[in-house]
UniProtKB/Swiss-Prot annotation:
It comes from Aquifex aeolicus (strain VF5). SUPFAM superfamilies: Class I glutamine amidotransferase-like. It comes from the Bacteria. This is Uncharacterized protein aq_1776. InterPro entries: Class_I_gatase-like (IPR029062).
Length: 236
């Protein structure tokens, strides 16, 4: 069964149809049976299995937050929200208008790593601490390392937040925060997920060619709600 992804642009996100930034993701997703549509109508998002908000610049309204909560907790959809470091363009504040409803916040910090990085650049944080989405649809491990460039850290504000990826022990936040870089809230009753990433560029045309970022990105996008007739499993 193919996966249908709605890539939102109603909050002025990066567009999936931007060839320079996301053509590799779109092409490889299609090969993997993942169909990504760019969506500019909020009311149309609920027909997709996976909904992506990649660097939203407009805060979410109370009504929109309630919609997203319903999609995750009742309809079993996966929602992915990706931010950026240093609260650039108030991205942390904007993301948190939605993320707080799922028990986490994007910190206004930057995480760097002087030891585990790409090509000696501390802002390109490389990590092997990947706890989820490290297996493909055949349950084979296909992700060992990923690079997360220009990333913020995430603060859990509810105890059931799951680690997707964290920095190595050498990763440091300039605000002293724990380097939790991608986190997730699971909705067991419905099989839904809400995933928050500290960076939105782990799957752009540069990063997606490095390490296992492509496999990680496809694993992350791969989701079919149990309501569509699939067996409920809690996990990637």
């Amino acid at each position: 069964m193919s996966v249908k992804v709605g890539w939102d642009i109603t909050h002025q996100e990066f567009t999936i149809t931007d060839y320079y930034y996301f053509s590799i993701l779109q092409r490889e997703a299609e090969k993997a049976g993942i169909e990504i549509d760019e969506v500019n109508d909020w009311e149309s998002l609920n027909k997709y299995d996976v909904i992506v908000f990649n660097y939203p610049e407009i805060p979410f309204t109370e009504s929109e937050v309630k919609d997203v909560e319903r999609w995750v907790w009742k309809d079993g959809k996966k929602v992915i929200l990706a931010g950026y470091y240093k609260n650039e363009d108030r991205i942390a504040d904007t993301c948190n208008t939605l993320a707080r409803a799922f028990g986490m916040e994007l910190n206004p910090d930057e995480v760097t790593d002087e030891v585990n990085n790409h090509n000696g650049d501390k802002y390109f944080v490389v990590t092997s601490k990947i706890r989820r989405y490290n297996k493909n649809d055949k349950n084979e491990v296909n992700v060992e390392k990923i690079v997360l460039a220009c990333t913020a850290s995430i603060k859990p504000i509810m105890p059931d937040t799951k680690i997707v990826a964290r920095g190595e022990d050498t990763a440091k936040s300039n605000m002293g925060n724990y380097p939790l870089l991608i986190a997730e809230q699971i909705a067991p009753p419905s099989g839904g997920y809400f995933c928050l990433a500290g960076t939105c560029v782990f799957w752009d045309n540069y990063s997606i060619t490095l390490y296992d970022n492509l496999n990680f990105s496809l694993n992350l996008l791969r989701h079919v709600p149990p309501s569509k007739g699939t067996k409920l499993t809690i996990g990637p």
